[in-house]
Amino acid sequence: MAQKIRKSTFKKDKNSSINGVVHIQSTFNNTIVTITNITGDTISWASAGSSGFKGARKGTPFAAQTAAEKAALDALSKGMKSVEVLVKGQGSGRETAIRSIEGAGFEVTSIQDITPVPHNGCRPPKRRRV
């Protein structure tokens, strides 16, 4: 019986743009960094959990820095040069994630805070007593 001859196909990179948007979602438990092009297609992403941190260490500023560097290096290798940064959430890793994006070699054009603020929506969780 004749065997099929397989052609080796490689995944073709989409036309990567030079400009992009860095979305940083920083919660108290984790930090997620997603880098997209202008139309919103994801180019690279990383989180504190995907960078090797587990448990309570995912919420630390160092974990956010590591995740941002990992996503930034991946996007830089695909040809991205300048980005605008959108930050959402009030976690401890937002400032260090922004600094590591700038330090990775991106030209940051703008930084915006898009944290959602409720207009008296859901009841917030009760205060912690330690």
UniProtKB/Swiss-Prot annotation:
Keywords attached to this entry: Chloroplast, Plastid, Ribonucleoprotein, Ribosomal protein, RNA-binding, rRNA-binding
Molecular function as annotated in GO: rRNA binding; structural constituent of ribosome
PROSITE patterns attached to this UniProt entry: RIBOSOMAL_S11
UniProt subcellular location: Plastid, Chloroplast
InterPro entries (alphabetical): Ribosomal_uS11, Ribosomal_uS11_bac-type, Ribosomal_uS11_CS, Ribosomal_uS11_sf
One of the protein's GO biological processes: translation
Cellular component aspect of the GO annotation: chloroplast; ribonucleoprotein complex; ribosome
Subunit structure: Part of the 30S ribosomal subunit.
Homology family: Belongs to the universal ribosomal protein uS11 family.
UniProt protein name: Small ribosomal subunit protein uS11c
Origin species: Trieres chinensis
Organism taxonomic ancestry: Eukaryota, Sar, Stramenopiles, Ochrophyta, Bacillariophyta
